[in-house]
Amino acid sequence: MEIIIISGRSGAGKSVALRALEDTGYYCVDNIPLDLLPQLTDILSQSQSSVAISLDIRNIPSSANSLEQTLSTLQKHHQIKIIFLEADRATLIRRYSDSRRLHPLSLKDLSLEAAIDEEYRYLEPLIQHANLILDTTHLSTHILAERLREFLRDNSEKELKIIVESFGFKYGIPLDADYVFDVRFLPNPHWDPTLRPMTGLEAPVAEFLNSHTEVNEFIYLTRHYIDTWLPMLEKNNRSYLTIAIGCTGGKHRSVYIAQQLGEYFQAKGKTVQIQHKSLERNKKI
């Protein structure tokens, strides 16, 4: 039986994710204690082929060993995938303020901020097992549902999807990144007044960066690093590999380098999605 476990931070969108999976045809179970999972899956396997189960902080044991043991038992008999939903701290605080709901750990007389931080510590062992980490900070419910459908399609095809994304450090590191490369030490087109309004997707900026040996060397060495370990990552039953390239504002250097890396792996026949987070963010503004 195929089992999708949905977990993540409270307020990150687990209920939306579970509804999206239900619409896709999964039999869904919301918030069952982890200890009851083996018994539940034994019963469901007699009548269901695809099940989605939501786990929140109230139903996850504080012991990492207990979590490991339960997941190991399930994996012996079923195909398990774990989807972990993330969002940045400020977004979670805003969502709780908007909904006027209590955080599950606020019942322990913690402030909302303290409850969010403590929850993250509890959930850390589960993050280590996640097949997909989705940062919902800037995702609408519609896009979140589409990302989940993409994951399920890619999962059925058993092909690793590479996401190469540029970002600006001043906006924060993407929470869903598997690898983060900092390119702030490279020559910056920002200091050229004619290049400043442009982006790393435009020819004059690309020509400026391509003219510097250190930029080309960085791209070559980064490609070589990923090429070296990609075969092992593909064998590791992953569905997504997210590579984040960051510069100060996410407008010039990171955009150019992310585009170069993404196009390189596309040319090698890999399934690649190129995203420019800070450019998309500024478009919305």
Swiss-Prot record:
The keyword Lipoprotein is annotated on this UniProt entry: no
Name of the protein in its database record: Nucleotide-binding protein NTHI1314
Pfam families with a match to the protein in the record: PapZ_C, RapZ-like_N
Intrachain S-S bonds: none
Cited PANTHER family: RNASE ADAPTER PROTEIN RAPZ
Binding positions (GTP): D56, I57, R58, N59
The species this protein was found in: Haemophilus influenzae (strain 86-028NP)
Similarity comment text for this entry: Belongs to the RapZ-like family.
HAMAP family: RapZ_like
Binding site for ATP: G8, R9, S10, G11, A12, G13, K14, S15
Keywords from the UniProt entry: ATP-binding, GTP-binding, Nucleotide-binding
